[in-house]
């Protein structure tokens, strides 16, 4: 037997995935027929047979969304998406555009990303009132001028630095962009009467071991603080890895294989949750419909995936033989990296919503006066490019634990830096 064809279009994603995992253990080539939806909507023939993709092994059944509830709060509204050119932000723009907003505003610091999604939406939705603006959420005057001019009803705040190892080496940038970019955008939303503010958060905010996760936890704390005193409904949506996003492992593995390998995995036991970008964004929109203010919505990410198994499957599906013409190299955990991620703390618990894939985590109590006081110290430390911002962060986020090896690494970098001498830095308060 040389080839296996899975020709059960009526099978759900889980059944298909389980069958493919068994078949993948053989040496046979694997092909699948399109699903039932394609049979109904398209002419399907043997020519439609395709190779099995890694997405077939990661996928889940179609996510059920209450379209009426999403339509009810997006249609006819002015919607601002910060970071609108990024992986999550651009998909937010795509899906919001389908619901006939009064005006959609793409706001991003990277002009090429913003231009790409602008051109895509102009072609697909020629009647859409679309504004594409370049600017930084770190710039108070810029973000406030946008809010004042366009008076958005809804803000999806997706602008953030998300790369864990890079932020470990540039912690002050994570603080400036993530923490105070969120603070300034949220403050502007409150000032100019935004009705709904949805923060895109991450599972790395739970018991963080890296500055990126700690910064996103502070973002959650910021919007929870605003929600207590503002007429704006401030909420956060927390989810794990999305495959296909900038910097995700699947594109990296494919590039490594195209270059002849090896495929690099940090640890044989590291696991992650995965969801497609469209799945995550559709649930973000649904969570926004449920929002009353102050909630942290947690998305059901499905079953965790061992990254080593993901690499092995991708090697197999790409036509290589592990150990013969493609190798896996284990490189060790990177600074700030965890073996596994958590979607919520034990204290947060879970409350169900109408959608079985969306839960609400119980907000953790914290001293808001102390929090705001520490934020001021953190702001000044980031402006001064100090090396102790991680320690200041750990005083603000009690669940943030810096790994000992990372402390030693940071200390060594600091000692070397001091030998070179430190140039003074003066500039406006985070108005870049």
Predicted regions, residues:
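Conserved Rossmann-fold NAD(P)-dependent oxidoreductase catalytic core, especially the SDR/UDP-sugar
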Residues: 26, 41-42, 157, 161-220, ...
């Amino acid at each position: 037997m040389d080839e296996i064809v899975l020709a059960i279009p009526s099978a759900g994603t889980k059944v298909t995935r389980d069958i493919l995992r068994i078949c993948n253990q053989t040496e046979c080539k694997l092909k699948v027929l399109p699903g039932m939806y394609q049979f109904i909507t398209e002419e399907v023939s043997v020519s439609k047979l395709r190779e099995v993709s890694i997405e077939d092994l990661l996928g889940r059944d179609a996510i059920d969304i209450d379209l009426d509830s999403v339509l009810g709060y997006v249609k006819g509204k002015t919607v601002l998406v910060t970071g609108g050119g990024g992986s999550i932000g651009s998909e937010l723009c795509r899906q919001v555009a389908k619901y006939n907003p009064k005006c959609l505003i793409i706001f991003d610091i990277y002009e090429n990303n913003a231009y790409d999604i602008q051109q895509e939406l102009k072609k697909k939705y020629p009647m859409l009132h679309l504004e594409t603006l370049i600017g930084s959420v770190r710039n108070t005057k810029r973000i406030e001028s946008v809010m004042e001019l366009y008076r958005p009803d809804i803000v999806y705040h997706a602008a953030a630095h998300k790369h864990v190892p890079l932020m470990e080496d540039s912690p002050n940038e994570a603080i400036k962009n993530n923490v105070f970019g969120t603070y300034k955008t949220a403050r502007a939303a409150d000032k100019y009467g935004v009705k709904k503010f949805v923060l895109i958060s991450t599972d790395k905010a739970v018991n963080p071991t890296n500055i990126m996760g700690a910064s996103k936890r502070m973002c959650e704390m910021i919007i929870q603080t605003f929600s207590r005193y503002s007429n704006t409904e401030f909420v956060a949506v927390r989810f794990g890895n999305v495959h296909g996003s900038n910097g995700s492992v699947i594109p990296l593995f494919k590039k490594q294989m195209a270059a002849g390998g090896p495929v690099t995995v940090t640890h044989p036991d590291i696991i992650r949750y995965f969801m497609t970008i469209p799945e995550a964004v559709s649930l973000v929109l649904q969570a926004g419909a449920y929002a009353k203010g102050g909630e942290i919505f947690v998305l059901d990410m499905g079953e965790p995936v061992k990254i080593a198994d993901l690499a092995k499957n991708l090697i197999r599906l790409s036509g290589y033989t592990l150990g013969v013409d493609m190798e896996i190299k284990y490189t060790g955990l990177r600074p700030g990296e965890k073996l596994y991620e958590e979607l919520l703390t034990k204290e947060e618990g879970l409350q169900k919503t109408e959608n079985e894939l969306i839960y609400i985590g119980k907000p953790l109590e914290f001293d808001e006066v102390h929090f705001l006081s520490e934020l001021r110290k953190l702001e000044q430390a980031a402006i001064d490019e100090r090396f102790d911002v991680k320690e200041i962060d750990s005083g603000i986020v009690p669940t943030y634990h810096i790994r000992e090896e990372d402390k030693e690494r940071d200390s060594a970098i600091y000692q070397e830096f001091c030998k070179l001498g430190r140039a003074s830095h003066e500039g406006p308060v985070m108005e870049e």
